[in-house]
């Protein structure tokens, strides 16, 4: 029995554990493992705390982002309203300006028509006076009624103008 290798391996193993027990290595080993477990628990608590803090920060940033988006939408809506108002004002101003220019053009056309009519009348009067002068001069003796002819022509000119 003492000659087998298994016996001596068992004896050495028991002796090794006895020496470890005598030097109280199991307590040191347990204390080290307990310390390591406490460190791991502390790290887990710190990780939970950091996770909660990160979730709070994320929620805060998401809320701020929603507020910023809402504010941006409000700004865009206000800009659209202002742009529509400006477009309406511009359209109204353009219509007023077109009406003014149309009225001015119509006035100029009416004035040009009146001027053209007056020019035609003046030309017709001059032609009529010239024709009347020639007809009267041909029918009336030049010496006898020259004064009458001149008087009639001046009256005719003033009446035609």
Curated annotation (Swiss-Prot):
The chain crosses the membrane at residues 1-21. One of its GO terms (molecular function) is proton-transporting ATP synthase activity, rotational mechanism. Coiled coil: none annotated. Keywords: ATP synthesis, Cell inner membrane, Cell membrane, CF(0), Hydrogen ion transport, Ion transport, Membrane, Transmembrane, Transmembrane helix, Transport. The keyword Lipid biosynthesis does not apply. Its main location: membrane. The keyword Membrane applies. It is a single-pass membrane protein. Belongs to the ATPase B chain family. F(1)F(0) ATP synthase produces ATP from ADP in the presence of a proton or sodium gradient. F-type ATPases consist of two structural domains, F(1) containing the extramembraneous catalytic core and F(0) containing the membrane proton channel, linked together by a central stalk and a peripheral stalk. During catalysis, ATP synthesis in the catalytic domain of F(1) is coupled via a rotary mechanism of the central stalk subunits to proton translocation. This is ATP synthase subunit b 1. It comes from Parvibaculum lavamentivorans (strain DS-1 / DSM 13023 / NCIMB 13966). The lineage of its organism: Bacteria, Pseudomonadati, Pseudomonadota, Alphaproteobacteria, Hyphomicrobiales.
């Amino acid at each position: 029995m003492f000659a087998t290798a298994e016996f001596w391996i068992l004896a050495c193993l028991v002796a090794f554990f006895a020496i470890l027990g005598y030097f109280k290595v199991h307590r040191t080993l347990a204390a080290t493992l307990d310390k390591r477990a406490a460190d791991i628990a502390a790290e887990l608590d710190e990780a939970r705390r950091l996770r909660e803090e990160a979730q709070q920060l994320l929620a805060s940033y998401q809320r701020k982002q929603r507020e910023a988006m809402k504010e941006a939408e409000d700004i865009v809506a206000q800009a659209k309203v202002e742009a529509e108002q400006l477009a309406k004002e511009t359209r109204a101003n353009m219509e007023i300006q077109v009406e003014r220019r149309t009225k001015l053009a119509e006035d100029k056309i009416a004035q040009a028509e009146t001027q053209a009519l007056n020019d035609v009348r003046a030309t017709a009067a001059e032609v009529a006076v010239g024709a009347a002068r020639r007809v009267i001069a041909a029918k009336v003796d030049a010496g006898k009624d020259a004064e009458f002819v001149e008087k009639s022509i001046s009256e005719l000119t003033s009446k035609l103008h």
